């Protein structure tokens, strides 16, 4: 049966949140103030979301679920069944966008706010202006990198001992994830540990104007968890009104000639405004201490694949990922010294421009507290410039129980950068 986007959006929320069928009592208001540096064109849907976000600090009464509003709250629940991933073994790029009607982001934000009304406010993060010369004649490209924490792993395997079980409930956590995406309005979204692609992110983000690709791990650890939602993997989304897809490659990474359980997606996109092409890639390397050589081999394999896709660095490149590696590891050094001439964007936030942030993930497990820098956005330094980057949460904001929490939905912080093409992109060396 056909469902309007409005009903669809509410259905996705309510499928996992039957409590919302009751009248919601207004709780402490949560603040969403999208910190956008400068003016940048957005899709009409995301412009509406930004306008809604600016007004979020004003108190509002949350309506009951009867009558007209029931259509809204019927929406984050009835799309694809939870077992949808098993029904899509081919993991195709996307459904036909002509058969999808857009969602109003303001309505989506309102639904998320209603679900999250009892949670504390989300913290503001500001963009740091990194421009060193006059701005480009074209609109910057905003890229978001984020390991969103697979739901099955958060509930079943990752042992976040200081995180209340209630903070991990999917019906609320997915709204925090969506809220973060809507707040920063990325043109390109690179995600890891996605285990709700078909039933949440693909149907919703496609109606916000994104085209998506999902590539699961062949032997996802999520499948070992009871009541899982299918395998986790990498997902890549881009705004269709800004970019044209030229090519897409799913890469199963190898190490010592052996195929591994880690994957990557690499896509060549063309900017509709400027006509310039670039490659965007997302990956998630092997985790855990003791696997450093394995990660190094995976990184070398990924670099070789990207070398071929970019025609020997002729095409500018952006690589986003959870590398599960500190800057002292070999795989980091491989990327820093690659012939692709890559630089790590978040080094630019340091006083000398040479140091990575002190952490991108901070959690407490049964084995102890883990504070590491594992997530990166690499870019072709002679073809692209970073014009701004989103600052990280402070230790005080993260709090003593660390991540995830009622404030923040993942154990990894999102990284967001604005890129512009250098005026002479052919001079890569």
UniProtKB/Swiss-Prot annotation:
Database matches in Gene3D superfamilies: Endonuclease/exonuclease/phosphatase (3.60.10.10)
Names of required cofactors: Mg(2+)
Main subcellular localisation: cytoplasm
Protein name: Nocturnin
Assigned EC number: 3.1.3.108
Region described as Disordered: spans on this chain: 21-68
Residues at which substrate binds: 193, 217-219, 261, 284-287, 322-324, 412
Positions contributing to Mg(2+) binding: 193
Disruption outcome: Mice exhibit metabolic defects including a resistance to diet-induced obesity, decreased fat storage, changes in lipid-related gene expression profiles in the liver, and altered glucose and insulin sensitivities. Exhibit a delayed early embryo development and at 12 weeks of age show enhanced skeletal mass and increased osteoblastogenesis.
Role description: Phosphatase which catalyzes the conversion of NADP(+) to NAD(+) and of NADPH to NADH. Shows a small preference for NADPH over NADP(+). Represses translation and promotes degradation of target mRNA molecules. Plays an important role in post-transcriptional regulation of metabolic genes under circadian control. Exerts a rhythmic post-transcriptional control of genes necessary for metabolic functions including nutrient absorption, glucose/insulin sensitivity, lipid metabolism, adipogenesis, inflammation and osteogenesis.
Transit peptide: 1-73
Cofactor, free-text remark: Binds 2 magnesium ions, but the ions are only loosely bound to the protein.
Catalytic activity: NADP(+) + H2O = phosphate + NAD(+); NADPH + H2O = phosphate + NADH
Binding partners and assembly: Interacts with PPARG.
SUPFAM superfamilies: DNase I-like (SSF56219)
Induction of the gene: Immediate early gene (IEG) showing acute responses to several stimuli including serum shock, phorbol ester, lipopolysaccharide (LPS) and rosiglitazone, a PPARG agonist. Exhibits a high amplitude circadian rhythm with maximal levels in early evening. In constant darkness or constant light, the amplitude of the rhythm decreases. Expression is regulated by both light and food-entrained cues and by the CLOCK-BMAL1 heterodimer and PPARG. Up-regulated in cells undergoing adipogenesis.
UniProt subcellular location: Cytoplasm; Nucleus; Cytoplasm, Perinuclear region; Mitochondrion
Keywords: Biological rhythms, Cytoplasm, Hydrolase, Magnesium, Metal-binding, Mitochondrion, Nucleus, Repressor, RNA-binding, Transit peptide
GO CC annotation, single: mitochondrion
InterPro entries recorded: CCR4/nocturin_mRNA_transcr, Deadenylase_nocturnin, Endo/exonu/phosph_ase_sf, Endo/exonuclease/phosphatase
Entry coiled-coil feature ranges: none
This protein's record includes keyword Protein biosynthesis: no
Gene name per UniProt: Noct
Tissue specificity note: Highly expressed in the differentiated adipocyte (at protein level). Ubiquitous.
């Amino acid at each position: 049966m056909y469902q309007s986007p409005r009903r669809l959006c509410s259905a996705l929320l309510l499928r996992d949140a039957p409590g919302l069928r009751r009248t919601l009592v207004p709780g402490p208001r949560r603040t969403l103030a999208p910190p956008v540096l400068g003016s940048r064109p957005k899709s009409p849907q995301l412009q509406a979301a930004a306008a809604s976000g600016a007004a979020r600090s004003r108190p509002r009464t949350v309506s009951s679920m009867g009558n007209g509003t029931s259509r809204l709250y019927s929406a984050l629940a009835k799309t694809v069944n939870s077992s949808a991933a098993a029904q899509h073994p081919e993991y195709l790029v996307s459904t036909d966008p002509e058969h999808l009607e857009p969602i109003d982001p303001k309505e989506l934000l309102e639904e998320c706010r209603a679900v999250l009304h009892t949670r504390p406010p989300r913290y503001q993060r500001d963009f740091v202006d990194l421009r060193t010369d006059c701005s480009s004649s074209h609109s910057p490209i905003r890229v978001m990198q984020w390991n969103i924490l697979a739901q099955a792993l958060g509930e079943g395997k990752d042992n976040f001992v200081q995180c209340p079980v209630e903070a991990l409930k999917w019906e609320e956590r997915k709204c925090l994830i969506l809220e973060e995406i809507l707040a920063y309005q990325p043109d390109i979204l690179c995600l890891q540990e996605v285990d709700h692609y078909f039933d949440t992110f693909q149907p919703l983000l496609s109606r916000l104007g994104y085209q998506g690709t999902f590539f699961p791990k062949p032997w996802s650890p999520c499948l070992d968890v009871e009541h899982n939602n299918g395998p986790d993997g990498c997902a890549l989304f881009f705004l269709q009104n800004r970019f044209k897809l030229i090519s897409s490659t799913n890469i199963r990474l190898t190490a010592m000639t052996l195929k591994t359980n880690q994957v990557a997606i690499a896509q060549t996109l063309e900017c509709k405004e400027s006509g310039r092409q670039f490659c965007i890639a997302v990956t998630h390397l092997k985790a855990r201490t003791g696997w450093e050589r394995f990660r190094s081999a995976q990184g070398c394999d990924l670099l070789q694949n990207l070398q071929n896709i970019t025609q020997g660095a002729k095409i500018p490149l952006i690589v986003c990922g959870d590398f599960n590696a500190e800057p002292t590891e070999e795989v980091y050094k491989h990327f820093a010294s690659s012939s692709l001439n890559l630089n790590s964007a978040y080094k630019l936030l340091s006083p000398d421009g040479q140091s990575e942030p002190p952490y991108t993930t901070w959690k407490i497990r049964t084995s102890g507290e883990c504070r590491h820098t594992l997530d990166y956005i690499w870019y072709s330094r002679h073809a692209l410039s970073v014009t701004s980057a989103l600052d990280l949460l402070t230790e005080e904001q993260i709090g003593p129980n660390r991540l995830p929490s009622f404030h923040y939905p993942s154990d990894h912080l999102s990284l967001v950068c604005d890129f512009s093409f250098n005026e002479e992109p052919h001079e890569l060396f």
